[in-house]
C-alpha cells in the first residue's frame, strides 16, 4: 500500500500538472468536435440509462463503462441507498454484466484489470441525476488512489459543463424540468353501452377481489410481524420511501430495497405498499363516503359520492383528485378537488332550471337527499295514495319537501349530520342508491322508503337482492335442478318480481324488463337487425339470425345461460345460423318458444294498459238514409294517404282540410287529387277561429314527426323539445274540433307515431289523449315491416289484422317483370337511402341481370300500397320520392282502421 507521507509531494505535483494539461487538451478537442458535429451529444459516465426520444451518441474520448446500461438493467452493487434513482423507477441492486468484447468482459462485476488505466473505476458508476454527480459518503479513499479519483472528478466536471451547454438539446426527458405525465380523466359516461345487470356483476366481482386481496394482505402482515429477525429489520430500515408521480393518476406505488431479495418477497412488498397506502390523504378533504357537488364541463353542479378506486375498477386517482360516483346514473369520474363542493353548499349548487328540465337531474337530487336524510335522521313521511297511478305525485311532493329541507341548511343537525358513518368510509364497501321512481313512470313501482328503519317494505329488499347477488345465474341453476319453476323468475334479468309472462319464450318478465321490451322490440339498427337481444333487450355482443326474413338478435350471455354453456360459440361456427325464433325445434335447453307467440306479442302491445282510462264513447251505426259525406281535418298530412284510403273505401268526402309544410308532399296531393284538398300551411298557424270557420269535422287524423321521439335517434330531444312538441298542436286542434256538449253526432280521431319511443313519452301521449295505443305492424298486410302505435276512438281498432286478396304480402309481388326478390319482406323503409339494404351483409333486395339492385320507386309504392307512379310528379328524384314514402302511412293498415267508418258516413 503506497505511503502518503511528505516524500511523495513533488511527484504528486507533477502528476497533477500533467493531468491538468491533459484535461485542457481533451477539452479543446471536445470543443472542436462539438463545433463540427453540433447534433452529437456526450453520454455521461456512470449515469444510469433512461429512455430518451433520441439515442445519445458516445464521443470518441469517452470510455465505455460496463455499468452504463438501459433502464431495465440493474445498477452497480456498490451503489448505496443515497444514490438517486429516476423518479418512480425501481432498480434492483445486482452485479452488472459487461458488454461482450469490452476490456472488462472477463472481470467479475465489471472491475478493470490491472494496468488498464483507461477503464473507469467502479466509483465512477455512481448515479448521476439532472447533471449533478452524487458522491458516496462513509467510504475512505487511500492516497494511492488519489490519481484515479481526481481523474474521475475532472471527467465529471467536463461532462457537467458539456451538459450545461446542451441543456434541453436531448428533449424534455434530459432537461432539468421534466415533462409532466398526461393525466387521464374519466368523464361521465361509458365508451359503450353497459347494461345495469352487467355493471352490477362487475361491481360484485371487484368487491370479492378486493376482499380477497385484503385477507391476503392481513395474513402477510401477520406472518411478517412474527418474523422478528434482525436481517428483516435492517431491510426495513434501509428501504427508501416510495415515490409516486403526483401528475400521473395511474402511477403505481413502488418499494425499493438496498439489496436483492427473492421474487416472492418483492411481490409481497409491492402488493403491501400498493394496497395499504391510504387514499385521499393529501390533506384537502373529501374522503370516502362524503356527499359532494361536482362540476364537469357541459353539466350543472351534479351531486355525487366520493368512492374508492377499488369500486371503479380502474386506477388510483392522482393527488388532488377524487373518484366520484354520480347520483342518477351511477357512473364514475375523476374530479379535481377545486371542482368539488360539500353537499351542504346546496343553496349555491342546486340549479332549479335543470331540475325542471332534466329527469336525470331530478333523479340524482332525489337519491342524494335520500342518503342525506338517512344520515341526518330526518324523517319525510311517504304519501300513500289509493290510486297507484298517482304515486308519481307522491314522489314529487316528497322530493319537494327534501329540497326545502336542504335549502334550509339540513336542520337541525346541519352539515355535521351529513358526514358518512364509519362503515361507509370502508374503501371496499359498495354503495347503492335508493330506488328512484320517475314521476312519469311512477306506476311501475311504489315510492321508495323514506328512511333506513323502513327496510321491511316489500320493494327495497328485492332490489337489494338483485343487486347484491348474481341472482339470474343462481335461479337458472335452480331451474335446471328442478328446484324452481322458470315461470316464477324473469328470464331477462333474474328478478323475482314477475308481473307477466314473456311473450316469446316460456318464462316470466318483470315490470322493468317489460318497459325495456316495449321500447326496444321494434328498434332496428342500420343493418336491419334488432338493436338489442330478443330475450333481455340488452347485451353487448349479439348473434344475428342468418335467415334473411328474420331480423332478431340474441346476446351471448342469454344464449350460454339459457341454452347451455358453449351454445354461443356453436352458433357462431354455424353458418347460416337460424335463431331460436325461426328454427325448426321449439326447445333449446331452457329456452322454449311459445307456440302462440304471434298472438301473445300482439296482445303484449295491445293490452299495455299502464294507465287505465274510461273507454271511448261508442257511437251507434247511422242508418243508411241519414248518412252524410265525411268532413276531415288532416294534420301533418304528408302525401294524402287518408284521402286516398277514404276514396278506396268508397266513402264520400265533403271537405278535406290538410296542414302540411313539405312542398313535394303538397305537390303530390294537389296533382293526384285534382285540387280537392284545401292546404292551410303550418299547423301552428291554425287557430280555434279557423276550426270553427272550416268545421264542423267528423274525423281528425294526424301523425307528428317522430325524429325527436324515436329512441333510434341518439340526438332525440323528446316530447317537449324540437319536433316532439308538435304533438301538442295535434292535441290542441283535436280539443277545438270536438263536438260541444249535447252534440251526439259521431266524431272520430286517429293519431299515429313510432313504436320505438321512450316509455315516458308514450305515457305522456296516452295521458293527454286519454287513450292507450294499439300496435299494428304492416308486415301482416304488406311486404314490409312497419310497426306503429295508433291512438284513437275508431271502432274495432283492436280487432285482428286480416289481409285481403289485393294485398301484396310478398316482395316478389311488388317487383317489375324480370326482377327477382331475394327476400320475402323488406325491413322498414325510412327516409334514409341505406334503409333499402337488407340483412347483416347489407344486400340489395332485388336480383336483376345477375346483379343486385335496389328497389325502384314504383316497387316501393307497391310495397306501401300506393298506386304505381303515385309520387311521380314534378320530376322528383328517386331519393326525394323515397323520403315522401318513408314518412307516409301504410295504405293497407289505414284501410283496416278506416273500414268501420262505412257504417257512419255516406258511400258512393
Curated annotation (Swiss-Prot):
Comp. bias (Basic and acidic residues): 14-37, 265-275
Omega-N-methylarginine: residues carrying this PTM: 167
Residue segments, region Interaction with the PRC2/EED-EZH2 complex: 490-582
Sequence positions that bind S-adenosyl-L-methionine: 637-641, 660, 682-684, 887-889
Modified residues (Phosphoserine): 102, 239, 251, 386, 389
Region of interest (Interaction with DNMT1 and DNMT3B), ranges: 195-399
GO biological-process terms attached to the record: autosome genomic imprinting; cellular response to amino acid stimulus; cellular response to bisphenol A; cellular response to ethanol; cellular response to hypoxia; DNA methylation-dependent constitutive heterochromatin formation; epigenetic programming of gene expression; genomic imprinting
Residues bearing PTM S-methylcysteine: 706
Reaction catalyzed: a 2'-deoxycytidine in DNA + S-adenosyl-L-methionine = a 5-methyl-2'-deoxycytidine in DNA + S-adenosyl-L-homocysteine + H(+); L-cysteinyl-[protein] + S-adenosyl-L-methionine = S-methyl-L-cysteinyl-[protein] + S-adenosyl-L-homocysteine + H(+)
Location relative to the cell: Nucleus; Chromosome; Cytoplasm
Tissue occurrence: Isoform 1 is expressed ubiquitously at low levels. Expression of isoform 2 is restricted to tissues containing cells which are undergoing active de novo methylation, including spleen, testis and thymus.
EC category: transferase
Zinc finger intervals, PHD-type: 530-586
Biased composition, class Basic residues, residue ranges: 44-54
Chain positions of cross-link Glycyl lysine isopeptide (Lys-Gly) (interchain with G-Cter in SUMO2): 158
GO CC terms of this entry: catalytic complex; chromosome, centromeric region; cytoplasm; euchromatin; heterochromatin; nuclear matrix; nucleoplasm; nucleus
Superkingdom as given in the UniProt entry: Eukaryota
Domain spans labelled SAM-dependent MTase C5-type: 630-908
Assembly notes: Heterotetramer composed of 1 DNMT3A homodimer and 2 DNMT3L subunits (DNMT3L-DNMT3A-DNMT3A-DNMT3L). Interacts with DNMT1 and DNMT3B. Interacts with MPHOSPH8. Interacts with histone H3 that is not methylated at 'Lys-4' (H3K4). Binds the ZBTB18 transcriptional repressor. Interacts with SETDB1. Associates with HDAC1 through its ADD domain. Interacts with UHRF1. Interacts with the PRC2/EED-EZH2 complex. Interacts with UBC9, PIAS1 and PIAS2. Interacts with SPOCD1.
Name of protein: DNA (cytosine-5)-methyltransferase 3A
Name of the encoding gene: Dnmt3a
Amino acid at each position: 500500500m503506497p505511503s502518503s507521507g511528505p516524500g511523495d509531494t513533488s511527484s504528486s505535483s507533477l502528476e497533477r500538472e500533467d493531468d491538468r494539461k491533459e484535461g485542457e487538451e481533451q477539452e479543446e478537442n471536445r470543443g472542436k468536435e462539438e463545433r463540427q458535429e453540433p447534433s452529437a451529444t456526450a453520454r455521461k459516465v456512470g449515469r444510469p440509462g433512461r429512455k430518451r426520444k433520441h439515442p445519445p451518441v458516445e464521443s470518441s474520448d469517452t470510455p465505455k463503462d460496463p455499468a452504463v446500461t438501459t433502464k431495465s438493467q440493474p445498477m452497480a452493487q456498490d451503489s448505496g441507498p443515497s444514490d438517486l434513482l429516476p423518479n418512480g423507477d425501481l432498480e434492483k441492486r445486482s452485479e452488472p454484466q459487461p458488454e461482450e468484447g469490452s476490456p472488462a468482459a472477463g472481470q467479475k462485476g465489471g472491475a478493470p484489470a490491472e494496468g488498464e488505466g483507461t477503464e473507469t473505476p467502479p466509483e465512477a458508476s455512481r448515479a448521476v441525476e439532472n447533471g449533478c454527480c452524487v458522491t458516496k459518503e462513509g467510504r475512505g479513499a487511500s492516497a494511492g488512489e488519489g490519481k484515479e479519483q481526481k481523474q474521475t472528478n475532472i471527467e465529471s466536471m467536463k461532462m457537467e459543463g458539456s451538459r450545461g451547454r446542451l441543456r434541453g438539446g436531448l428533449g424534455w426527458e434530459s432537461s432539468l424540468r421534466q415533462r409532466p405525465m398526461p393525466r387521464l380523466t374519466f368523464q361521465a359516461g361509458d365508451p359503450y353501452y353497459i347494461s345495469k345487470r352487467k355493471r352490477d356483476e362487475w361491481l360484485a366481482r371487484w368487491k370479492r377481489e378486493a376482499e380477497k386481496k385484503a385477507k391476503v394482505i392481513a395474513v402477510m402482515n401477520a406472518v411478517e410481524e412474527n418474523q422478528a429477525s434482525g436481517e428483516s429489520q435492517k431491510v426495513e430500515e434501509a428501504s427508501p420511501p416510495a415515490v409516486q408521480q403526483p401528475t400521473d393518476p395511474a402511477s403505481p406505488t413502488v418499494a425499493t430495497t438496498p439489496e436483492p431479495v427473492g421474487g416472492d418477497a418483492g411481490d409481497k412488498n409491492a402488493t403491501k405498499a400498493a394496497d395499504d397506502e391510504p387514499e385521499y390523504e393529501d390533506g384537502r378533504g373529501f374522503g370516502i363516503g362524503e356527499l359532494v357537488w361536482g362540476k364537469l364541463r357541459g353539466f350543472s353542479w351534479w351531486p355525487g359520492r366520493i368512492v374508492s378506486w377499488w369500486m371503479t375498477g380502474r386506477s388510483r386517482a392522482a393527488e388532488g383528485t377524487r373518484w366520484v360516483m354520480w347520483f342518477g346514473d351511477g357512473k364514475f369520474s375523476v374530479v379535481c378537488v377545486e371542482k368539488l363542493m360539500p353537499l351542504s353548499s346546496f343553496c349555491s349548487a342546486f340549479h332549479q332550471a335543470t331540475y325542471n328540465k332534466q329527469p336525470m337531474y331530478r333523479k340524482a337530487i332525489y337519491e342524494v337527499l335520500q342518503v342525506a336524510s338517512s344520515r341526518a335522521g330526518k324523517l319525510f313521511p311517504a304519501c300513500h295514495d289509493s290510486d297507484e297511478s298517482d304515486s308519481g305525485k307522491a314522489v314529487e311532493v316528497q322530493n319537494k319537501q327534501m329540497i326545502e329541507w336542504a335549502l334550509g341548511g339540513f336542520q337541525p343537525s346541519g352539515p355535521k349530520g351529513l358526514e358518512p358513518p364509519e362503515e361507509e368510509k370502508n374503501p371496499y364497501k359498495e354503495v347503492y342508491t335508493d330506488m328512484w321512481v320517475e314521476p312519469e313512470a311512477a306506476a311501475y313501482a311504489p315510492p321508495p322508503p323514506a328512511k333506513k328503519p323502513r327496510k321491511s317494505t316489500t320493494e327495497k329488499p328485492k332490489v337489494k337482492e338483485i343487486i347484491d347477488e348474481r341472482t339470474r345465474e343462481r335461479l337458472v341453476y335452480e331451474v335446471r335442478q328442478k328446484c324452481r319453476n322458470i315461470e316464477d323468475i324473469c328470464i331477462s334479468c333474474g328478478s323475482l318480481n314477475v308481473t307477466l309472462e314473456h311473450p316469446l319464450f316460456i318464462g316470466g318478465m318483470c315490470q322493468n324488463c317489460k318497459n325495456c321490451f316495449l321500447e326496444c322490440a321494434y328498434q332496428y339498427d342500420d343493418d336491419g337487425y334488432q338493436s338489442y337481444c330478443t330475450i333481455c333487450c340488452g347485451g353487448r355482443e349479439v348473434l344475428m339470425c342468418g335467415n334473411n326474413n328474420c331480423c332478431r338478435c340474441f346476446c351471448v350471455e342469454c344464449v350460454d345461460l339459457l341454452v347451455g354453456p358453449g351454445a354461443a360459440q356453436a352458433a357462431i361456427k354455424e353458418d347460416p345460423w337460424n335463431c331460436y325464433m325461426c328454427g325448426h325445434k321449439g326447445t333449446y335447453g331452457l329456452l322454449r318458444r311459445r307456440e302462440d307467440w304471434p298472438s301473445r306479442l300482439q296482445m303484449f302491445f295491445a293490452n299495455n294498459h299502464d294507465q287505465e282510462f274510461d273507454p271511448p264513447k261508442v257511437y251507434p251505426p247511422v242508418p243508411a238514409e241519414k248518412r252524410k259525406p265525411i268532413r276531415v281535418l288532416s294534420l301533418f298530412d304528408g302525401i294524402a294517404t287518408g284521402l286516398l284510403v277514404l276514396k278506396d273505401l268508397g266513402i264520400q268526402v265533403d271537405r278535406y282540410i290538410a296542414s302540411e309544410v313539405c312542398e313535394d308532399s303538397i305537390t303530390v296531393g294537389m296533382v293526384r287529387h285534382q285540387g280537392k284538398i284545401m292546404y292551410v300551411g303550418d299547423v301552428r298557424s291554425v287557430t280555434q277561429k279557423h276550426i270553427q270557420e272550416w268545421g264542423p269535422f267528423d274525423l281528425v287524423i294526424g301523425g307528428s314527426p317522430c325524429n325527436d321521439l324515436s329512441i333510434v335517434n341518439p340526438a332525440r330531444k323528446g316530447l317537449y323539445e324540437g319536433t316532439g312538441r308538435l304533438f301538442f298542436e295535434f292535441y290542441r286542434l283535436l280539443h277545438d274540433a270536438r263536438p260541444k256538449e249535447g252534440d251526439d253526432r259521431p266524431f272520430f280521431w286517429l293519431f299515429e307515431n313510432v313504436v320505438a319511443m321512450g316509455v315516458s313519452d308514450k305515457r305522456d301521449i296516452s295521458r293527454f289523449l286519454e287513450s292507450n295505443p294499439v300496435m299494428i305492424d304492416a308486415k301482416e298486410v304488406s311486404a314490409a315491416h312497419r310497426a306503429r302505435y295508433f291512438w284513437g276512438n275508431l271502432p274495432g281498432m283492436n280487432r285482428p289484422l286480416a289481409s285481403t286478396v289485393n294485398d301484396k304480402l310478398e316482395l316478389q309481388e311488388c317487383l317489375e317483370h324480370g326482377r327477382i326478390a331475394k327476400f320475402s319482406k323488406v325491413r322498414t323503409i325510412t327516409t334514409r337511402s341505406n334503409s333499402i339494404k337488407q340483412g347483416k351483409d347489407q344486400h340489395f333486395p332485388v336480383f336483376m341481370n345477375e346483379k343486385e339492385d335496389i328497389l325502384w320507386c314504383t316497387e316501393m309504392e307497391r310495397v306501401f300500397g300506393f298506386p304505381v307512379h303515385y309520387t311521380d310528379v314534378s320530376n322528383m328524384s328517386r331519393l326525394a320520392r323515397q323520403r315522401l314514402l318513408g314518412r307516409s302511412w301504410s295504405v293497407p293498415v289505414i284501410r283496416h282502421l278506416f273500414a268501420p267508418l262505412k257504417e257512419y258516413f255516406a258511400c258512393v
